[in-house]
A protein has these predicted regions:
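Ubiquitin system architectures
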Residues: 1-34, 41-263
Length: 263
């Protein structure tokens, strides 16, 4: 990758996903837009409700209702052709602001063994953190989030989640123990554990080592993607990347590294 480390966050914040959205009641009238990979679909709901003049609260891709995840992570999970064709309809409403801040608190706890850094922040600063995501404003986000990453405490673990898409029962998928479990189309499971940023001999923990520790059957080698690889922000993640550096440069705005398994 030719992008320098210092510009990786800016590049990620600038990345967009083009969308082609229709309402179930008006399939021939699309709403065309592009949204940041770090944004959330629910932020479009007021505009969509006004555009379609109909209640809008849930998003569907090929009849699968999408979860309340960052757009970039959803794109990694479903690997759609672009523009991504979605259908919006009425359904369960999302409270993404509270969900986002709760995820930030959880990431803070994982990093240091407590959530003191985020809990000590003022209401004004936590509001600014969320507003920076709404506005896709990396500069404003960095001013607040840097305080969480450069806390006067020992960094213990990297907030890390591994998403494993399930193989539909009729897809003829691999039935070996290393393959993702069969399930409904579009479903997935999440593997999450406390992953130290340092090895027992005080060397930086690498992504491949963490994957092998978490799922040795699926990742028998810590050096090479023998049976499976993982995607982060639309590209294959290198197994030799230090987790601590990845956390600082390539985590989602809520502080989590979110990898999607590709078999």
């Amino acid at each position: 990758m030719s992008t320098s480390a210092s510009s990786i966050p800016q590049a990620l914040w600038a990345a967009q996903v083009p969308l082609h959205i229709t309402h179930r009641s008006a399939p021939s009238t699309p709403f065309i837009t592009s949204v940041p990979r770090f944004s959330y679909l629910s932020l479009l709901l007021p505009r969509l409700s006004a555009f379609f003049d109909a209640p809008c609260s849930s998003f569907h891709f090929e009849d699968v209702q999408l979860r309340n995840l960052a757009v970039g992570l959803l794109a990694d999970l479903y690997a759609p052709s672009l523009p991504w064709r979605l259908v919006v309809d009425d359904g369960v409403a999302w409270d993404i602001g509270d969900t986002f801040l709760n995820s930030v608190k959880e990431a803070d706890f994982v990093r240091y063994g407590n959530a003191n850094q985020i809990m000590k922040m003022s209401k004004e600063h936590t509001t600014q953190l969320w507003n920076s995501v709404i506005d896709n404003d990396y500069a404003a986000f960095s001013k607040i989030h840097t305080r969480l990453l450069n806390a006067p405490a020992t960094l213990k673990h990297a907030p890390m989640r591994v998403y494993i898409p399930s193989t539909p029962p009729d897809a003829g998928g691999d039935s070996s123990p290393s393959a993702p479990a069969a399930g409904e189309a579009g479903s997935f499971r999440i593997v999450q554990s406390l992953v130290p940023v340092m090895t027992p001999d005080r060397k930086p923990k690498l992504l491949g080592q963490a994957l092998k520790d978490l799922m040795p059957t699926l990742f028998p080698s810590s050096r090479d993607p023998v049976l499976a690889s993982v995607v982060l922000h639309g590209v294959s993640a290198p197994f030799d990347a230090p987790l601590g550096e990845m956390m600082r440069e390539a985590a989602y705005p809520d502080g989590w590294l979110c990898f999607v398994v590709v078999v």
